[in-house]
Amino acid sequence: MSRFGHVELEDMPDDLRARVGAVAEKSGFVPNVFRALARRPAELRAFLDYHDALMDSDDGLSRAERELVVVATSGANHCTYCIVAHGAILRIRTKDPEIADRVASNPWGVELSARERAIVDLALLVATDSASLTEADLDAARDAGLSDDEIWDVGAITALFAMSNRLAHLTALRPNPEFFLMGRLPRA
């Protein structure tokens, strides 16, 4: 599951056990990322706080658009864990069983709306060559309808998942088997 071991839910500090337990209750399993990061509780708390501030916001980008950023950039970063886990969430949020695979495997060629294309293009630029970012790139995002706060969110989500992708590589984090079918088949 992780080359550095993991912590079971019942062995997590009380606050993390409650927080991760709520996710497990909703999904039916404990995502491996929480079990792996729980070996360093202060870091897991900081990660969850920033993750939730970015990914659970109802302002600006939709929750599906936020997941689109994660899947596209995790694909560019070759992060299997995040592609699989967030691909499941993207499939559920969009009710499209194919979108995550299409975005992760070929984000440049997948058919998207103009707004989604601008989000993916900006996220990929930040993920792969942020030093080359210009005002023209930001103007292209604005022209597609993104506000400055939404542009910020694209960059912040990309940055958070750059860290997450690299930790997943370092730890050899494996996706939970449950993620692979989520959003592909009707719920039982």
Give a label for each model feature:
Residues M1-A188:
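Hydrophobic alpha-helical segments
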